[in-house]
Amino acid sequence: MKTTTRLLDLTAAMVLVVYVSFSPPLVSGEPGRRVSMTLVRDAAALGAFCLDGSLPAYHLDRGFGAGSNNWILQFEGGGWCNDIASCVERAKTRRGSTRYMSKTVVFTGVLSNNASQNPDFYNWNKVRLRYCDGASFAGDSQFGNGTSLLYFRGQRIWNAIILDLLPKGLAKAHKALLTGCSAGGLSTFLHCDNFTSYLPKNASVKCMSDAGFFLDAIDVAANRTMRSFYSQLVSLQGIQKNLDPSCTHAFFPEPSLCFFPQYVLRFIKTPFFILNSAYDVFQFHHGLVPPSADQTGRWNRCKLNVTACNPHQLDALQGFRKDMLGALMNFFRNSTRGGMFINSCFDHCQSALEETWLSPTSPRINNKTIAETVGDWYFGRGEEAKEIGCPYPCDKTCHNLIPASTSDFLASNASGSGHNSRGTHLTFLFLLLNFFFFFVISKFSKKDYVT
């Protein structure tokens, strides 16, 4: 299928979210627990395959003590593929095949079994669902042309993993939390109510999305890049039939809009928590300012260092935050069982690592960490757990992935561990990858490509 350069840019850029979302933890102190992979052997009978036809997988760390009947499931993130060429390439990597995945993963942050780092969930059964379908566990189709064979079976993978976990104790869960980061965070919006339907009626079941509230944004060139991308994704991978029917009916004749969390949110019945940065780095770089919307490179310096942004660019960033809060306002005002933590950091995924989830230097709003806010919401401690941070540059507790202040820039060039060790380690890679993408776009942005 023929796509615009705009979609090619976004597809290529997904490698950023792969690293940012689920890289090895960059934290000082004790390492997290390493957990082995479990292949879903019965998945083949359900037609549940990764893109390349390999079996899906998950990692299970058993709960103990008072948490032995409680479960937390985390969708892995890692972008999407919306056309045949990008899915063919993805199938040759760990994002499209369990053959290339690490057989063990480290559990940190909300999956940590350390009581001091994860006091509310440390002793629960913890599961990471490996991501290998390229469509947030939502597709149900396949493609074959005699040369390539691709399985778009994310929905079946989701079902197969749940069916594998039910006899292992999930069917008797007392408490459960479905969560995920990035593309996995988007998965929680798509599967939250379905998750609830599998569990006992008297179980306390809730869902939390981390960095998964992808906006239907208008970019700086007045295009809807993400809408175009998701529309092709929904069509290619046969997602429409798995979207919430109440939502697709409400948004007919554009059912693919229901892949956006802002549109499906009001149809979700299960209590929901939204963790997101109002200046999410992935959305800043590929929703608000995708390379195709800035072919002359006017935004290059700003995208790599927020202190280099001019007043017009800062206004656009503040406008993006305003749009995100606007999309969340009905939920903020009217959801009696919902929770939220919307800070003003240049970050992407904050529940997966100790230093942003719960540590002495974790991000805070009203002096509450993310872990404290989520715990208060889940267990009903105190008043409503809905926190919205003040706009950039007022938040001094951030772990920014790109420099957003003079202190961030100095930290990224300083030796040793500091307040922003995650940003320190990731800044160089982030800059390198972005310069690579800018180079590619400068070479090819004047043409359309079959991707």
From Swiss-Prot:
It comes from the Eukaryota. Coiled coil: none annotated. It is found in: Secreted, Cell wall. Pfam families: PAE. GO terms for biological process: cell wall organization. Residues 1-29 form the signal peptide. The active site is at S182 (charge relay system), D280 (charge relay system), H348 (charge relay system). Keywords: Cell wall, Cell wall biogenesis/degradation, Glycoprotein, Hydrolase, Secreted, Signal. Disruption phenotype: Reduced inflorescence stem growth and increased levels of acetate in rosette leaves. Its EC number is 3.1.1.-. One of its GO terms (cellular component) is extracellular region. GO terms for molecular function: pectin acetylesterase activity. InterPro entries: PAE/NOTUM. Glycans are attached at N114, N145, N194, N202, N223, N305, N334, N367, N413. Belongs to the pectinacetylesterase family. Hydrolyzes acetyl esters in homogalacturonan regions of pectin. In type I primary cell wall, galacturonic acid residues of pectin can be acetylated at the O-2 and O-3 positions. Decreasing the degree of acetylation of pectin gels in vitro alters their physical properties. This is Pectin acetylesterase 9. It comes from Arabidopsis thaliana (Mouse-ear cress).
